Regions:
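DEDD superfamily 3′-5′ metal-dependent exonuclease/proofreading module
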Residues: 1, 46, 52, 56, ...
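Metal-dependent nuclease catalytic cores that hydrolyze phosphodiester bonds in DNA/RNA
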Residues: 1-130, 170-172, 263
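Short coil/turn segments at secondary-structure boundaries
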Residues: 27-29, 60-65, 99-104, 215-221, ...
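Short, polar/flexible loop-turn hinges at active-site or ligand-entry regions and domain interfaces
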Residues: 29-37, 56-58, 139-145, 162-165, ...
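Mg2+/Mn2+-dependent nuclease catalytic core
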Residues: 39, 97-206
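Hydrophobic/aromatic-lined pockets within catalytic cores
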Residues: 52-56, 137-140, 155-163, 206-209, ...
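Short, charged, low-complexity amphipathic alpha-helix
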Residues: 172, 194-264, 363-379
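Extended, charge-rich alpha-helical segments
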Residues: 268-379
């Protein structure tokens, strides 16, 4: 897989700059440091691309030997991705003799977004439907295809290539995220997608490219390079932090509901500020009223081989025998083999109750009050 260039208004960051247009130019002033998670995702994409091309009879070079983050889990995930795409291709062949299938296709949506381009993992065109499939290797954030601006930008780029060649009337977008057991699909008419592009995407992209518009903080701040020093984010969180807090029983229900809706972002922001200040201090910056000290440290062996030798000579066993945890075991065996051998021995206890917004897709728990009411209803 060829190295990818990055646009100022990239599709992958579109959720952020569509909500907060000035963040695009602000982030341009920061170095792109990357992360281990991003590198792992790049490796997974390369492996998935190879498997798909091989299955489709296209020339491809096996990248496995050069993949730093290769694992049995990645092998399983990318095999599942390839199988899923092939299933969609076979389904397309039921209504179209010769569907168009493209892997890692560069798309250009600069008609709406200045310098707008990206790479679609898979595009399938058949029977009036343009289908875009995107592989997500990430585990931390569940990604939905519904109203996903990255997917909509890729779809617009694909329409730029093929709308004049094929009679397309519907666009289907799928997120394949195997480590979260998530396959999310969203469909939209071509007309509605173009309407969004003209009425929302294009005018907001013009603001963002010019560095104009208003700063707005929200969950999209999580991947913003400027999140630690952003004044708008600080002001929004400090406004909540300066709330005239009383003992919780004295707050009204409405006040508590407002706080619940914002407290996670407040905690995240505070954590980001602490980490930023620490890294700056380690680089030599002095913060008034604060100093660097050594944190708590645990004892450790400085020569494990010598410890083993000494303990064994004394007649003791220095090793602890402990079963691998579920995540480590799945990584060792691979998901398919893990499921085959151990599914019967896995249980998932009830999780600890937590308050989440109503938009959360998990079903609501039954409280003791609800259980009591249900019992009375059944009497």
């Amino acid at each position: 897989m060829a190295a990818k260039a990055h646009a100022i208004l990239s599709a992958s960051s579109s959720d952020r700059w569509l909500h907060c247009p000035p963040s695009a130019r602000l982030c341009e002033t920061y170095e792109d440091k990357g992360s281990d998670y991003a590198a792992e995702g790049t490796d997974a994409h390369a492996l998935g691309e190879f498997k798909l091309k091989t299955a489709l009879g296209l020339p491809a070079e096996d990248p496995t030997e050069s993949l730093k983050w290769y694992s049995e889990e990645m092998e399983d995930c990318t095999s599942g991705y390839a199988e899923y795409v092939l299933e969609q291709v076979e389904a397309a062949k039921e209504t179209c003799a010769d569907p168009v299938v493209l892997i890692e296709q560069r798309v250009d949506f600069s008609r709406w977004v200045e310098q707008g381009f990206g790479t679609a993992d898979c595009i399938i065109i058949a029977d009036g439907t343009l289908r875009v499939i995107d592989y997500k290797h990430g585990l931390g954030v569940l990604v939905s295809a519904e109203g996903n601006p990255q997917m909509q930008c890729y779809s617009l780029g694909a329409l730029e290539l093929f709308d004049a060649l094929y009679d397309i009337d519907k666009v289907s977008m799928t997120i394949y995220q195997p480590r979260r057991q998530n396959v999310s699909t969203y469909e939209i008419s071509k007309e509605d997608l173009y309407r969004w592009a003209d009425e929302v995407l294009k005018p907001t992209a013009e603001l963002a490219f010019a560095g104009d518009g208003n700063f707005l903080c929200g969950e999209w701040c999580g991947f913003c390079k400027a999140k630690n020093e952003c004044r708008a984010r600080a002001e929004a969180n400090l406004k909540l932090a300066q709330h005239d807090f009383k003992l919780p029983p004295l707050l009204t229900d409405t006040e508590i509901e407002v706080i619940l809706g914002k407290v996670d972002e407040l905690v995240s922001w505070a954590s980001d500020i602490k980490e930023y200040a620490l890294q700056q201090a380690l680089s030599g910056k002095e913060w008034s009223g604060f100093k660097l000290v050594e944190g708590r440290a645990n004892r450790r062996y400085n020569n494990e081989a010598a410890v083993i030798d000494a303990v064994e000579k004394a007649g003791f066993d220095p090793y602890e025998k402990k079963l691998l945890g579920i995540t480590a075991m799945q990584k060792l065996l691979g998901k398919s083999r893990f499921d085959e051998l151990l599914t019967a021995y896995i249980e998932k206890p009830q999780g600890k109750p937590t308050l989440v917004p109503e938009s959360d897709k998990r079903p609501a728990m039954n409280t003791a009050k609800n259980d009591f009411m249900e019992e009375n209803d059944n009497e």
